[in-house]
Amino acid sequence: MNNMNVIIADDHPIVLFGIRKSLEQIEWVNVVGEFEDSTALINNLPKLDAHVLITDLSMPGDKYGDGITLIKYIKRHFPSLSIIVLTMNNNPAILSAVLDLDIEGIVLKQGAPTDLPKALAALQKGKKFTPESVSRLLEKISAGGYGDKRLSPKESEVLRLFAEGFLVTEIAKKLNRSIKTISSQKKSAMMKLGVENDIALLNYLSSVTLSPADKD
């Protein structure tokens, strides 16, 4: 089996440590870089001979942002780099939008400890990886009767930040878009989800996440 050079990006040092220790148990995986923000990650990517990036979905960074914005930038400027997203966000609408970016895998931080090694093993075979926990979440989209959940990546990014507590004005600044654009994308997403106000939106975002009984 060919060796796989991996970069890890997460803004929590203890998470970086845990991932590295987990990957050290896989003899064909080499960790060649660890970064705590997207700016440091992007600045160092050209210097590293990496095959795979394991990155958090929500991570600080000034110029390059995080989430879908960061993933799209990396895929555009580093097309040969495979991407596995590691996230605490288990909202199916957002996970669906992330998968639409044609990444190689997505792993929930609260999922099974074996999911990340399985994702890398699948990647070695030229396959993508979606754990059962994520597949079950995506099934809730059709089973829950919440309307058309096919959010665009931009709509998904706005909802992710809104769910994290950011105001529309703050989201506009963070994503370098106008307040009018952010408001329009938020309204469009709400129409797709069939919710009429912010309270209903927050209730939806919390109601279609992973319940304890659903976990691996």
Swiss-Prot record:
Positions of the DNA-binding region: 168-187
One MF annotation (Gene Ontology) recorded for this entry: DNA-binding transcription activator activity
Domain HTH luxR-type residues, every copy: 144-209
One GO term describing the cellular component: cytosol
InterPro entries listed in its UniProt record: CheY-like_superfamily, RcsB, Sig_transdc_resp-reg_C-effctor, Sig_transdc_resp-reg_receiver, Tscrpt_reg_LuxR_C, WalR-like, WH-like_DNA-bd_sf
Phenotypic consequence of D56N: Decreases heterodimer formation with RcsA. Does not affect heterodimer formation with BglJ
Post-translational modification as stated in the protein's UniProt record: Phosphorylated and activated by RcsD.
Induction context: Expression is dependent on the alternate sigma factor, RpoN. Repressed by hydroxyurea.
Function: Component of the Rcs signaling system, which controls transcription of numerous genes. RcsB is the response regulator that binds to regulatory DNA regions. Can function both in an RcsA-dependent or RcsA-independent manner. The system regulates expression of numerous genes, including genes involved in colanic acid capsule synthesis, biofilm formation, cell division and outer membrane proteins synthesis. Also involved, with GadE, in control of glutamate-dependent acid resistance, and, with BglJ, in derepression of the cryptic bgl operon.
HAMAP family hit by this protein: RcsB (MF_00981)
Listed name of the protein: Transcriptional regulatory protein RcsB
Species per Swiss-Prot/TrEMBL record: Escherichia coli (strain K12)
Organism lineage: Bacteria, Pseudomonadati, Pseudomonadota, Gammaproteobacteria, Enterobacterales
